[in-house]
């Protein structure tokens, strides 16, 4: 069976894709929506796809970034939470980096690709840790989306989220177990060649490797 993977270049979608390699013939898609990290995300998604031996397509969604509403696309200081376990603080961080309707748009486009290519599934990297502050990463969102697809697709395309019940630590452990080269993943909001080390995404990445006790191949500026 074929599947479409929404591959951002980050480790969550990378591990989700790697975990599904034995089950599906995968075609990865990556979006350029005007985010600061677009150049790096596209590069790493392409390199990882080459490593995995899967097809990869880049899609231009510049209009989504032009809507504004996020420091990832409209400029401004990228927030750096002082405590990743402080839900209130991380909720405020999430509001600043939230891109309006991003997962709705990405997943819907993935479904369109799946229907057009006779693929039965769309693979996403939604996870338990991010679901605490991003509701469009939650199991509730997944279940609701799949209920919608029962009506909105002809052949019953499903969204598959293999890491949705995992923390970042567990994602690193799962990726390590299947031999995923984490050096071919990129997580930083800032978009520089070297990870900044202080945005929330970098902080969660670094902590995940530390908690897992697995060597982190990432170079951080701070």
UniProtKB/Swiss-Prot annotation:
GO terms for molecular function: ATP binding; ligase activity, forming carbon-nitrogen bonds; zinc ion binding. The keyword Transport does not apply. Its EC number is 6.3.4.20. Pathway: Purine metabolism; 7-cyano-7-deazaguanine biosynthesis. Zn(2+) binds at residues 188, 196, 199, 202. Its cofactor is Zn(2+). It is an enzyme of class 6 (ligase). Belongs to the QueC family. Catalyzes the ATP-dependent conversion of 7-carboxy-7-deazaguanine (CDG) to 7-cyano-7-deazaguanine (preQ(0)). This is 7-cyano-7-deazaguanine synthase. It comes from Methanothermobacter thermautotrophicus (strain ATCC 29096 / DSM 1053 / JCM 10044 / NBRC 100330 / Delta H). The lineage of its organism: Archaea, Methanobacteriati, Methanobacteriota, Methanomada group, Methanobacteria. The gene is queC.
């Amino acid at each position: 069976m074929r599947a479409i993977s929404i591959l951002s270049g980050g480790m969550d979608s990378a591990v989700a894709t790697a975990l599904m390699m034995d089950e599906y013939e995968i075609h990865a898609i990556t979006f350029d929506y005007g985010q600061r990290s677009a150049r790096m995300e596209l590069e790493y998604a392409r390199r990882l796809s080459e490593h995995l031996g899967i097809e990869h397509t880049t899609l231009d969604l510049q209009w989504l970034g032009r809507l504004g509403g996020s420091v990832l696309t409209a400029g401004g200081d990228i927030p750096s939470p002082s405590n990743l376990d402080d839900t209130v603080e991380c909720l405020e961080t999430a509001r600043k980096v939230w891109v309006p309707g991003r997962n709705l748009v990405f997943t819907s486009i993935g479904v369109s690709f799946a229907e057009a290519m006779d693929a039965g599934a769309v693979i996403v990297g939604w996870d338990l840790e991010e679901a605490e502050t991003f509701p469009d990463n939650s199991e509730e969102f997944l279940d609701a989306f799949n209920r919608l697809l029962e009506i909105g697709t002809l052949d019953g395309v499903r969204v598959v989220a293999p890491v949705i019940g995992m923390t970042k630590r567990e994602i690193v452990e799962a990726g390590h177990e299947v031999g995923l080269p984490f050096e071919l993943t990129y997580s930083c909001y800032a978009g520089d060649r070297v990870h900044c080390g202080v945005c929330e995404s970098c902080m969660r990445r670094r902590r995940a490797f530390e908690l897992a006790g697995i060597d982190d191949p990432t170079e951080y500026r701070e």
